[in-house]
Amino acid sequence: MRYSISIPQTDVDGFDGEGLRSYLTRAEELGFEGGWTLEQVIGPTPLIAPMELLAWAAACTTTLRLGVAVMITSLHDPLQLAATVTAVDRLSHGRLDLGVAPGGGRRKFEAFGVDPATFISSFTEGLQLMKAAWSDEPRVTFHGRFRDVDDLPISPKPVQRPHPPIWFGANAPRAIARAVRHGDAFMGAGSSTTQDFATAVQILRTELAEQDKDPNAFRIGKRVYLIVDDDAARARERVLAGLRRIYGSMPGVDAVPVAGTPDDVARGLREVIDAGAQTLLLNPLGAGLEEDREQMERLAAEVIPQLD
């Protein structure tokens, strides 16, 4: 098993650079493999943009892998995003993990000039163009439905070859098939229940076999929202308050977190592992950086040892 931790992104009362630097270096000391952000451009809580924060985090760390799960890449220009990904991978000396998804549901595509009728096709084509930009070819030619590029010089290239690992977020069977076709790994959403994740993993494994992909080379992870508290009822209240800050009143979200005493949380995480997770992205939902730091310490000392 591999364990990663979320990187706090909330920026309400001002950015606490020293506090976050201490959090990141402590995550390395505690042995977490990675630190991950998420993307939410429009939402009820102000969050620092993920890639920019990862670039800052790269300067604060030396071994921690740096990830985002997930970027809604259909909302971004692919060449600009490819350049940003390259920059963060180079600044971190090859430590970036890139999570992608086309979006859907309540996404306000029109605000970004994206056609809701074609966003999935545009997403897939955009990912193909990004891979072309990251390739060893010094000049890129690409002709698609949405974009035309002729003999365009693109440099530099990412440190990781052929590109940073691409993690897909997906729930529907067709989306999972797309993840296997175009991705390197799968990250179950924090907003999905353990049972929904288990179902997705079964579909994923079937797709890996049907597409003749090596299941040992396709890593499976899940973001898990959680709170550890000696009072189980208080833990539940705290984790639900955290979910409201991220998702507002999204239906069904109350069923997704793991909360309670250290034993309760270990039990809930064991269920996620049994469902197929090889990487756990542990996402405390404290009310601020200090609470998230305390949660990280408790996870490392009281929960993870029960899982190993």
Give names to the regions the model predicted:
Residues 1-308:
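Active-site-adjacent structural elements that line small-molecule/cofactor binding pockets in enzymes
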